[in-house]
Amino acid sequence: MGSTSSLYAAIDLGSNSFHMLVVREVAGSIQTLTRIKRKVRLAAGLNSENALSNEAMERGWQCLRLFAERLQDIPPSQIRVVATATLRLAVNAGDFIAKAQEILGCPVQVISGEEEARLIYQGVAHTTGGADQRLVVDIGGASTELVTGTGAQTTSLFSLSMGCVTWLERYFADRNLGQENFDAAEKAAREVLRPVADELRYHGWKVCVGASGTVQALQEIMMAQGMDERITLEKLQQLKQRAIHCGRLEELEIDGLTLERALVFPSGLAILIAIFTELNIQCMTLAGGALREGLVYGMLHLAVEQDIRSRTLRNIQRRFMIDIDQAQRVAKVAANFFDQVEKEWHLEAISRDLLISACQLHEIGLSVDFKQAPQHAAYLVRNLDLPGFTPAQKKLLATLLLNQTNPVDLSSLHQQNAVPPRVAEQLCRLLRLAIIFASRRRDDLVPEMTLQANHELLTLTLPQGWLTQHPLGKEIIAQESQWQSYVHWPLEVH
């Protein structure tokens, strides 16, 4: 068993889907080996007396037989299986669980709504970057969890009896996507939310994070349609109108919405609109992890780091043997440039963080080959698991690294949606200049420079005589000015 002792598994018997996550512990963080998800729709098998139908239980057991095969290689002490809302509710849950334990060969724990909310929050805290004070929303099949917290500590936990499967059965049973069905679903959701809204608002939040299939589906729709990844009430209302326009559930077609998610999408959307309205949420982003990640990190007893992005960057630098001193050097020059033009260009703090992150990884492509290093870097960053970074932020980092040198591919900077295209162009310019001026790989050879921005014109002032004393540097900067001019980025160097 020794060789497999670094493997851990978390299984979540949800009301809509059963999920299994298998990971390996590597140097204080986790590497995902397997993710299996099966739509079981257990909640749909509850009758008016809250008894699970034999068909629903059989669907669940069939799924667990698949999971059991994978669990044979993992020590039982490193497996956690939890059941949530539907099995909390079902009067015959004992029958289902007895057979489930027999199939899996390990205990199945029915957790309370509050414990579910706590675990979801831990999963988010371990995997999601951004501000420390957060509101986490998870819309499940039969329950919705709402949690506020700061860092690793929760400040309020609520598990509410509404979910995308139960709301589907209750308000969209006729499969009609009319305004009246949405109104009824939203009104009911707001009534469920009202008793807890004041306490959630009292604790407050700086960022709101969504950790469910509904939010994942929204993210996929927005990425497919070229929008930025921030979920707003305006976007939710637009999608609702699109759904109403489709008329019926079986005719629901939205760019980016998969067939698998379509069935419970309208009910999840109605609940999310109610949450946004009742709590006056301005904007929400997708979490990096939730319940299963919370279970895994709980088994590993790993502390929540203050800055998840920094941990991720450190791990990647070690793994790909990136020259950390050089990465820091480039980051320092880039930060200096950013601070000098920040006001004129109206740049936000998150843009600075993403620029510094790009600097930390800019030489990752060398681990493949010097030839086409920027392309290798972009490929690696696009495809690596980067906890703390959203999918859109990963795409921006990859795009910046692709354009760190050589002629600029303007279209790629416009295809990312983490920041506006103009901001992506500006960050790219700063990264390219920082790499040039730190290229001698010594702190004492980085010149004192001032960088001024006047609209899109950048004026770089070097120490007197520097260009004369550094003929190669002069040639590289002349080439860079030319490349930037090709894409209408004026650069003057004195």
Curated annotation (Swiss-Prot):
Report the InterPro entries cross-referenced here: ATPase_NBD (IPR043129), GppA/Ppx_hydrolase (IPR050273), Guo-5TP_3DP_PyrP (IPR023709), Ppx_GppA_C (IPR048950), Ppx_GppA_N (IPR003695), PyroPPase_GppA_Ppx (IPR030673)
**Any GO molecular function:** guanosine-5'-triphosphate,3'-diphosphate diphosphatase activity
This protein's pathway reads: Purine metabolism; ppGpp biosynthesis; ppGpp from GTP: step 2/2
Q: What class of enzyme is it?
A: hydrolase
Q: What is its EC number?
A: 3.6.1.40
Instruction: Give the record's keywords alphabetically.
Output: Hydrolase
- Which reaction equations make up its catalytic activity? guanosine 3'-diphosphate 5'-triphosphate + H2O = guanosine 3',5'-bis(diphosphate) + phosphate + H(+)
| Physiological role | Catalyzes the conversion of pppGpp to ppGpp. Guanosine pentaphosphate (pppGpp) is a cytoplasmic signaling molecule which together with ppGpp controls the 'stringent response', an adaptive process that allows bacteria to respond to amino acid starvation, resulting in the coordinated regulation of numerous cellular activities.
Report the sequence similarity comment from the record: Belongs to the GppA/Ppx family. GppA subfamily.
Q: What NCBIfam families does UniProt report for this protein, alphabetically?
A: PRK11031.1
Official protein name in the record: Guanosine-5'-triphosphate,3'-diphosphate pyrophosphatase
Its gene is gppA
